[in-house]
Amino acid sequence: PSLAAALKAKILDFKYWWTEPPITETPGANYYWTENHQIIFAADEYLAGLVPYYVRAATLARAAGFDAVDIKACHRYLVSELLASFTRENSRYGGAFENRVRLLVDVVRAVRDAVPDLEVSSRLNLYDALEYPYGWGVDREEMTRADLTEPKRLIAQLMALGYHGLNTTIGNPYYNPHFGRPFDTPITGMYTPQEHPLESFARFIRITAEVQRAFPDLAVVGSGHSWMRQFYPNVAAALIEQG
């Protein structure tokens, strides 16, 4: 059978994505909270070795009929963490700007070379809302202010590598979710933001708008608009009208 048919069969196979008890570990296990779990440092060799896996995944996606792939660079997952790796000393993936963006740029370049007819894009954190030197896209003196100098520099590189569109986001949904997902009432156990949701939403709009105006030829897709509820279409229309 074709690769697409084989993938579909696997997805529809219940046992493919769920192991019946007894099991020793589950995909959802969070080892961060596990007692005596040793956090393993991701050495440079390990990070460099990830690039072929991205290429393999992109190759399979194209063979399965996909037109594009999204290389995640947001919400403090691996690539996002590296963008803010100011304190990673003596590493090809930390410190200087060129080092911190290295993994993402290397992955994009490798995927483009291996699958040239596959559209490549990313969901990119523009502003982590974490104090420097732990946050990307933040003002070094005041973390409540965004500084998009480096994010825009990265976007220019990604466009040179063939990006035609980009999805923007900010903050970390697991740590400071109100920045990227404004809400009225926090979930149980979550903090209460010290600002009105409209302020959070307006900040997100301003940050995304700065990127769109800096790169008018780039299709910029915003996020975090759901708080506007029934007014979302009106807001979207106004944003498009105002560029």
Show where each model-derived region lies.
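Flavin-dependent oxidoreductase catalytic cores
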Residues: 1-243
